[in-house]
Amino acid sequence: MDLEAKVKKMGLGHEQGFGAPCLKCKEKCEGFELHFWRKICRNCKCGQEEHDVLLSNEEDRKVGKLFEDTKYTTLIAKLKSDGIPMYKRNVMILTNPVAAKKNISINTVTYEWAPPVQNQALARQYMQMLPKEKQPVAGSEGAQYRKKQLAKQLPAHDQDPSKCHELSPKEVKEMEQFVKKYKSEALGVGDVKLPREMNAQGPNRMCIPGGDRSTTSAVGAMEDKSAEHKTTQYSCYCCKLSMKEGDPAIYAERAGYDKLWHPACFVCSTCHELLVDMIYFWKNDKLYCGRHYCDSEKPRCAGCDELIFSNEYTQAENQNWHLKHFCCFDCDNILAGEIYVMVNDKPVCKPCYVKNHAVVCQGCHNAIDPEVQRVTYNNFSWHASTECFLCSCCSKCLIGQKFMPVEGMVFCSVECKKMMS
């Protein structure tokens, strides 16, 4: 790819979602504007997933690329125009008759994703076993949750070097090898089955979602109400409770045929969020989402959110950073050798701290320098000096003395307090 094409691609990436409102900050954010190298909005500092950005095609491309060159090619399709793999997510539309006074109307519910099984009754019951706020019904809180988890759990920059910032040729090669390795050793997609079906599942049968799907014989089991409350020989690998015979369970091939999960228990062992679209990574007998699997293998830069493939990086405040990304969160000035203050787990240089974050002294009404001693009570602060921490009535210095606080004022005695009331 020549320089002009690279610049154009970079520009398109930064134009994506431009101006989209922030769902978290509301009117406080002027609209989404991607930071040059951080994966956040320049205006409000929230991530792209917190903004109302339409990303359906982009997310399908990302997941499609993840499944490329794996056994899960049945879940992708390549566009004839550019050959880019696209994720063929299973969309489920349910129609429910609703009785009205004069006639019957039809209520349609669209799930933006559903497990790719032929038996729709099984897929429907799977959805009902998820918390309502996490069911991906189009236009709902659950659909927004799925969108957010797709961005959080499966970052494009964890699999595609072109989505990363200024990797060297050596780093690109190392990343490609890393991605190839986790695709072959850890990546998997859960499959929905009835526990009774596992008896017929042998170790020589591979179950690929979208390929070997549940058969229509499962319909009878779904409709057998007497079976719904019977327990089985299987227990959930997560919560350890028994599986009910008529309830769907999730099976993960890499975990083995002896492990099953309740739909709501198929979660990442680190963040404990539902594994989006049942996409998992298996390591040391644990389920991980893509992000936390990669975190267990490589250091991640707290500045740009990318995995670090360089041998040289810095560690500060129990986090890892590319050398060039240990910068002030407000102004982006490099902090190596400089005084900084951590604000919400983000490093901020001294000038920006004083300007944007420092508490104001109740005595002199000036910002309190981060290196200066202070006195704090509830939400109020004072310079720990004879000029500032004084009785609000008689101006007696209160350092080392007992005092009586009243909102933003302090008093040395009951008498002084009464005089000011």
Swiss-Prot record:
Gene Ontology MF annotations: zinc ion binding
Species of the source: Sus scrofa (Pig)
Record-annotated LIM zinc-binding domain positions: 234-297, 299-359, 362-421
Domain PET: 92-199
Listed name of the protein: Testin
UniProt record, GO biological process: negative regulation of cell population proliferation
Sorted UniProt keywords: Cell junction, Cytoplasm, LIM domain, Metal-binding, Repeat, Zinc
InterPro entries per the UniProt record, alphabetical: LIM1_Testin, LIM2_Testin, LIM3_Testin, PET_domain, PET_testin, Pk/Esn/Tes, Znf_LIM
Family: Belongs to the prickle / espinas / testin family.
Coiled coil: none
SS bond partners: none
Domain text: The N-terminal and the C-terminal halves of the protein can associate with each other, thereby hindering interactions with ZYX.
Compositionally biased region (Basic and acidic residues): 155-164
Annotated GO CC locations: cytoplasm; cytosol; focal adhesion; plasma membrane; protein-containing complex
Role noted for this protein: Scaffold protein that may play a role in cell adhesion, cell spreading and in the reorganization of the actin cytoskeleton. Plays a role in the regulation of cell proliferation. May act as a tumor suppressor.
Subcellular location: Cytoplasm; Cell junction, Focal adhesion
Region feature (Disordered): 133-164
PANTHER family hit by this protein: LIM DOMAIN-CONTAINING PROTEIN, TESTIN
Quaternary structure and interacting proteins, as annotated: Interacts via LIM domain 1 with ZYX. Interacts (via LIM domain 3) with ENAH and VASP. Interacts with ALKBH4, talin, actin, alpha-actinin, GRIP1 and PXN. Interacts (via LIM domain 2) with ACTL7A (via N-terminus). Heterodimer with ACTL7A; the heterodimer interacts with ENAH to form a heterotrimer.
